[in-house]
Amino acid sequence: MKQFSAKYALILLATAGQALAASTQGISEDLYNRLVEMATISQAAYADLCNIPSTIIKGEKIYNAQTDINGWILRDDTSKEIITVFRGTGSDTNLQLDTNYTLTPFDTLPQCNDCEVHGGYYIGWISVQDQVESLVKQQASQYPDYALTVTGHSLGASMAALTAAQLSATYDNVRLYTFGEPRSGNQAFASYMNDAFQVSSPETTQYFRVTHSNDGIPNLPPAEQGYAHGGVEYWSVDPYSAQNTFVCTGDEVQCCEAQGGQGVNDAHTTYFGMTSGACTW
């Protein structure tokens, strides 16, 4: 894993201090540990869920051969939650989905008025929708007092966002954690997500959109093509810590997106010191 230099870290922190008038620096250790836990699961999804927390029980796999969408249903009896995690880009087939920027009506969620979502990720979603809904229903029926958590990194983050949106129409206890999420839909979709996941305040939000340093993927697809982000952004700046995590609730270009990153870079593949699929944590 490549390490950021101390000089670069200071530059990022200085930039943050100048640009984030509508944001706050520092989160609680409990929330930080929660974000790290979800990042661990999301990064482990690239390597068949290696080194996930010991409290988590690995359940059924989600898979479609045509789209190469991979995911799992997990359960944590300690935290009382059912976790759906999606792997990020892992093949040329996934890359074809990544680069399909055509905004597409979110037809599987008609109550999301005027919502359009990333065309490639919508293809991915409908390829596994029946599996996901069936497996979640099975687990939720067996464990009715458990929360439903959805997470993922990169492509997996957008898959998580579409999944969480769909599940929120049926269940009222859905939480979403994404890492390096591309813009997943238009402003109507972002607004729907913000309403459904109580994003009006960091105290109420159930949509935690985590970014890192100058990760270039959250800048894609371009806003100029009709895309927008939802959620409360939690921007992690190196050296990563609870204190170096910014809560960004204003304009989405204040934090990660303002750093000028483009595409897949070191900041995208590594979150909280964990590199996608490396399993060295």
Curated annotation (Swiss-Prot):
Protein name: Probable feruloyl esterase A
Glycan attachment points: N100
GO terms classed as biological process: cell wall polysaccharide catabolic process; lipid metabolic process; polysaccharide catabolic process; xylan catabolic process
Active-site feature positions: S154, D215, H268
Membrane-spanning ranges: none
Disulfide bonds: C50-C279, C112-C115, C248-C255
UniProt family annotation: Belongs to the AB hydrolase superfamily. FaeA family.
Subcellular location: Secreted
Chloroplast among keywords: no
EC numbers for this chain: 3.1.1.73
PANTHER family: FUNGAL LIPASE-LIKE DOMAIN-CONTAINING PROTEIN-RELATED, TRIACYLGLYCEROL LIPASE, PUTATIVE (AFU_ORTHOLOGUE AFUA_6G06510)-RELATED
Molecular function terms, GO-annotated: feruloyl esterase activity; hydrolase activity, acting on ester bonds
Coiled-coil blocks: none
Keyword Signal: yes
